[in-house]
């Protein structure tokens, strides 16, 4: 996961 909050679309996880 990136520095984005959980639940938000994360391109690094896509």
Swiss-Prot record:
Catalyzed reactions per annotation: 2 superoxide + 2 H(+) = H2O2 + O2
Coiled-coil region list: none
E.C. no: 1.15.1.1
Alphabetical keyword list: Antioxidant, Cytoplasm, Metal-binding, Nickel, Oxidoreductase
Keyword Cytoplasm: yes
Domain of life, per lineage: Bacteria
Gene Ontology MF, one: metal ion binding
Family that this chain belongs to: Belongs to the nickel superoxide dismutase family.
Complexes and interactors: Homohexamer.
Protein name (Swiss-Prot/TrEMBL): Superoxide dismutase [Ni]
Upper classification of the organism: Bacteria, Bacillati, Actinomycetota, Actinomycetes, Kitasatosporales
